Amino acid sequence: MKNQDKKNGPAKHSNSKGSPGQREAGPEGAHGRPRQTAPGAEAEGSTSQAPGKTEGARAKAAQPGALCDVSEELSRQLEDILSTYCVDNNQGGPAEEGAQGEPTEPEDTEKSRTYAARNGEPEPGIPVVNGEKETSKGEPGTEEIRASDEVGDRDHRRPQEKKKAKGLGKEITLLMQTLNTLSTPEEKLAALCKKYAELLEEHRNSQKQMKLLQKKQSQLVQEKDHLRGEHSKAVLARSKLESLCRELQRHNRSLKEEGVQRAREEEEKRKEVTSHFQVTLNDIQLQMEQHNERNSKLRQENMELAERLKKLIEQYELREEHIDKVFKHKDLQQQLVDAKLQQAQEMLKEAEERHQREKEFLLKEAVESQRMCELMKQQETHLKQQLALYTEKFEEFQNTLSKSSEVFTTFKQEMEKMTKKIKKLEKETTMYRSRWESSNKALLEMAEEKTVRDKELEGLQVKIQRLEKLCRALQTERNDLNKRVQDLTAGGITDIGSERRPEATTASKEQGVESPGAQPASSPRATDAPCCSGAPSTGTAGQTGPGEPTPATA
């Protein structure tokens, strides 16, 4: 018997350090082996007790009853656990059906189970927190899966971005054509205002959709809490089953130890009672038959318990596998949503910076244009009011987006059914950004038109200065002619006639030399006189200039 125990000892250690296939068996082998060895130990004890005295016979009669009591208690505990767990499953209804395929724990937890099942103690290498063993947090396959998903998303986004760019180019060309058909800038601004109103309506619709999505998120969070509660119940049932398995192992060990002690005692007794061996053979045979019957019963009970435990372990492993897969899928979806939100925030920041730069540029040009002409001041005031409205509405839009982003950060943990609708919202934000860029381009074109008009005004001012110089020259000539007329009146009529002819020829020559510059200056003065405040005064001076020498010549 001692030799057999020594052989069984290293066999157990070798099995615990065996191949991965044996590790996957988990607690099944740990629970099955002691139960199979227990009847053999009892049989050996029965054979050794046969030649004993009446006291040994009484002890034998009392011990099978105790063994039956222990086995009955263990079977009752198992039935209680099964009944409570089955009741929980029936009460859970359809909510637990998705959680029945929970995934199994990793290989480390399986090793800890086998270790605990064989020795009745937790493995020292793995820490226990709140009655559960910590699993390995970082798996090597998740990073590769994330990288492959990111590459697939980029490949899928490229054709979509190309299609979006083509659609945006067509919309911009249509908008530019409609703006070019309009003649006045007021009509262009009215068209832009209409398009901006359409954008506001679309934005309000998107806000309503965001509220609906938030409600759905709250429902998903409630479902997640329900699933966690069910998972905790399953973990409690598993802990109870593990405690039951440990009690069974302890019971089997106690049986083995008792069998070994009895074998030793009976070996000593055999040496003393070898003479009475032939008389007690009949009694021994009867006792052997009784023990065999009891052992067969115990074996059947152990086999039934082992089958039940195997079924329960398989169910737990399936459920744990399903739960691990669900959590990994949800983590990947959360990471994708976070990345998309960051991209949208960066795009919004860039649009704000561009808008501020363009606003400052337009304000500077407006100040300069106010100094140049009063008519452009009125148009610039209208543009400033519209820009103020745009900025206020854009700030409201930005505030709503910031609030929505805060709501998304609070509900980051599980987003299963929201990815499709979030993609639609991202498409709408890209459309909004494209339309904002088109409006900004239209404003830049207005600024370019303003610079062209400023250049035209400068050319007109140069022409007006030239006309003023001509008028001054004509006035000096008129004064000279008046002086000469006054001098000639005193000299005589004959001298006046001779002097007028050469003066008329010189005046006609001077007018012929200066007329090419005056003719082109007069045409733009007539057309562009309303654009500046100084034009009417110069025009009157130009009209009186060439008209005054006529009475002198007459």
Curated annotation (Swiss-Prot):
Residues 1-66, 85-166, 492-554 are annotated as: Disordered. GO terms for biological process: B cell activation; exocytosis. Pfam families: Taxilin. Residues 143-158 have a biased composition (Basic and acidic residues). The modification Phosphoserine is found at residues 71, 515, 523. PANTHER family: ALPHA-TAXILIN, TAXILIN. Binds to the C-terminal coiled coil region of syntaxin family members STX1A, STX3A and STX4A, but not when these proteins are complexed with SNAP25, VAMP2 or STXBP1, suggesting that it interacts with syntaxins that do not form the SNARE complex. This is Alpha-taxilin. It comes from Mus musculus (Mouse). The gene is Txlna.
